[in-house]
Amino acid sequence: MKSVRYLIGLFAFIACYYLLPISTRLLWQPDETRYAEISREMLASGDWIVPHLLGLRYFEKPIAGYWINSIGQWLFGANNFGVRAGVIFATLLTAALVTWFTLRLWRDKRLALLATVIYLSLFIVYAIGTYAVLDPFIAFWLVAGMCSFWLAMQAQAWKGKSAGFLLLGITCGMGVMTKGFLALAVPVLSVLPWVATQKRWKDLFIYGWLAVISCVLTVLPWGLAIAQREPDFWHYFFWVEHIQRFALDDAQHRAPFWYYVPVIIAGSLPWLGLLPGALYTGWKNRKHSATVYLLSWTIMPLLFFSVAKGKLPTYILSCFAPLAMLMAHYALLAAKNNPLALRINGWINIAFGVTGIIATFVVSPWGPMNTPVWQTFESYKVFCAWSIFSLWAFFGWYTLTNVEKTWPFAALCPLGLALLVGFSIPDRVMEGKHPQFFVEMTQESLQPSRYILTDSVGVAAGLAWSLQRDDIIMYRQTGELKYGLNYPDAKGRFVSGDEFANWLNQHRQEGIITLVLSVDRDEDINSLAIPPADAIDRQERLVLIQYRPK
């Protein structure tokens, strides 16, 4: 009966965090709107080989992540949940692997359940795992690779070893098809310390070629298909998206070596108090085969991405699966021997909640700021934010009431965040970051437009997805669409600022022309270098400018 109660509690936890509140959050630009529109166009066109964004070739990522996202929209429709269904599915599958792997390592059902709950409630896992980007997919394939390699190396017979390495190759191949060749580098770097300490080089060299073969065979069908359709895909994807993004001096998202230290700290909430002990205990027990394996899969990817010049918080998502297992193992030891770390964890959560309550007041309409984050008419959003942090502090306090037994309730600290964050976003943020909000406000003006131009790729993708059309034209800026716009068949999909007046004269009689521009909050739109408009509708950071036929 206790096992049944635990399962019911786990399903309720998943429903409250990963299912029920997802539709209440509008899509964020540029990431979510971009991937939503790519998958919508894939479904609309039936082209499952070449990814397109706004009808243009889009070679920044391979195809597998778009496949999963497209299936999500196909099953659940073109809505907020449908767009995020793929990443939620991948996150839950990763959690299932955490359960299985923990159970296999320690043969303890309670430990396996706790590791799963810790993983799903980690702030970084929840934030990225309910956000429509490709990182939850690559995290799943990397964790699957971690499990496959362990299976292979623990097998006694050649059949088991062969099957494990073949499975490892498939996971690496799917990782390559999701986000590229990093899916090969990370597993190799992660297993080397374990192989070295356990002196298992012989098995690696004898069976490793099976992983190489299955990886190549996994990628080959689509790799050949896109090479035939778009011969320059692999050149662009390898040199620009890998070498330039991660290694060169002009890499995207440049950040210092220590960039991931605050990411690890914030991402470990509400279990931050367990982080030092989990890592220290893992290192102290490094002679234990399973512990050093998990520690290696936590530390090595972190070091790899720290050395790379281009950095984003999402890159290290896969590190938190083995870290959650180490945390759960350490937490049970602490509860049994010395619960100091569990008490510290409770106080950290109380401090975080109280700090959030105070910060919310400071930026509220009743605080000391001259330009508050929320306006007076958004009072209910302030109370939602207070509720988020109040619940965080409350469950932090509750874990201290009988810490040896109540410490797992720290998993409920982000409950308010999960349920209420969609209702607490300030309008000033929504107007710039949620194109759906803008579309809702301007639907009647946008719908009959013959041409729609915008100066932001994220806004363009949001408009395209909301209006179910891929013919949005880029104005003044090309952004990440620069490469796709260079193709001859993309002529007419970009209008520069200098050309706009002439372009307008040529196309005005064809129907309503709508210009959607991103502007600064205090910018005077009358100073924009554009022809006089027939209608202007400003929604704070976004402004709709319309020209009607004369």
UniProtKB/Swiss-Prot annotation:
Lipid bilayer topology: Multi-pass membrane protein
Keyword Nucleus among record annotations: no
UniProt GO molecular function: 4-amino-4-deoxy-L-arabinose transferase activity; mannosyltransferase activity
Annotated pathway: Lipopolysaccharide metabolism; 4-amino-4-deoxy-beta-L-arabinose-lipid A biosynthesis
Entry's transmembrane regions: 7-27, 81-101, 111-133, 137-154, 165-185, 204-224, 255-275, 288-308, 315-335, 346-366, 382-402, 406-426
Catalysed conversion reaction: 4-amino-4-deoxy-alpha-L-arabinopyranosyl di-trans,octa-cis-undecaprenyl phosphate + lipid IVA = lipid IIA + di-trans,octa-cis-undecaprenyl phosphate
Key words, A-Z: Cell inner membrane, Cell membrane, Glycosyltransferase, Lipid A biosynthesis, Lipid biosynthesis, Lipid metabolism, Lipopolysaccharide biosynthesis, Membrane, Transferase, Transmembrane, Transmembrane helix
The keyword Oxidoreductase belongs to this UniProt entry's keyword annotation: no
The organism's place on the tree of life at top rank: Bacteria
GO biological process, one term: response to iron(III) ion
One annotated Gene Ontology cellular component of this protein: plasma membrane
Documented EC number(s): 2.4.2.43
InterPro entries per UniProt: ArnT_tfrase, Glyco_trans_39/83, LipidA_mod_glycosyltrf_83
Cell location: Cell inner membrane
Membership in a protein family: Belongs to the glycosyltransferase 83 family.
Role, per record: Catalyzes the transfer of the L-Ara4N moiety of the glycolipid undecaprenyl phosphate-alpha-L-Ara4N to lipid A. The modified arabinose is attached to lipid A and is required for resistance to polymyxin and cationic antimicrobial peptides.
UniProt xrefs under PANTHER family: MANNOSYLTRANSFERASE YKCB-RELATED, UNDECAPRENYL PHOSPHATE-ALPHA-4-AMINO-4-DEOXY-L-ARABINOSE ARABINOSYL TRANSFERASE
Designated name of the protein: Undecaprenyl phosphate-alpha-4-amino-4-deoxy-L-arabinose arabinosyl transferase
Taxonomic classification: Bacteria, Pseudomonadati, Pseudomonadota, Gammaproteobacteria, Enterobacterales
